[in-house]
Amino acid sequence: MSCPKRLLSSSLPLLITSKYRTGYEGVTLRRLDTMLRQCNAHGYFIGLNCHVCNEEGKFIMSDREMSGIGRLMAGVLRHFPEKFNLEMDINGWINIGSMTDSFKEQRHYYHWLRPWHFKAICECDDKGRFQIEGDMIRATYAHSIEIELDHPTDDIPEALYWPCNPEEIETYLELGLKPSEKQNYVHLSKTIRNAMEAGHVHINRPAIIEIDTTRSIADGHVIYRAGTTVFLTEAVLPSYIDVMPSDDPVIQEIVSEWEEEEAAKEEE
């Protein structure tokens, strides 16, 4: 008996148990780590069992497939829709059906892709990177192409956070925050932890700048709610920023977690 090529090629490493979930007798193939599944009662989820009712649910895609499609979605919706011959409107929206067809045409290993697969990825993305309205989809932040944002501007926290290299703090205190060359907006984080995690991608021990959003908004500057933890603004003046002390309890807790992870890796 042979199993479907897509499952075998995209679901390694595999745990062999007693019954393959789609009806093949003899084996069950499951990822040892994460996968995207669907519970009939509670919708899409990541993991082996529904977080609400603990039912196994229906297999949708492996973590490798989810990661690969997610990266492709981010690239197309943020940076290069023209490479996939897709039309984007002024607010960043692209037709889901057209994107499905284009992905299948240009990436043949996604021949199984359907529009609802994009919905599954969007609903399980804890960063809120994507938004679906009807039959349209867009990225919520990190665009390098020019679009006109129509994100909500209400319910902005009193303070937001931004990570930076500790050696560059004085520059930001003097000049404020401006978008990078690859982005159209300054991307601010909802919490210190969010900012630390964002900064840790490129900086070993990022410093954290706190932004007084109450004063900024009162002075007429617009801040948008984009992803789940991401907020956007065109710039932040020096008068609205301050540096979080390195001995802040939250920062110290996160650094301790990183140090434990690093020590564990060295022991492997």
What residues fall within each predicted segment?
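Eukaryotic, polar/proline-rich low-complexity intrinsically disordered regions
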Residues: 2-268
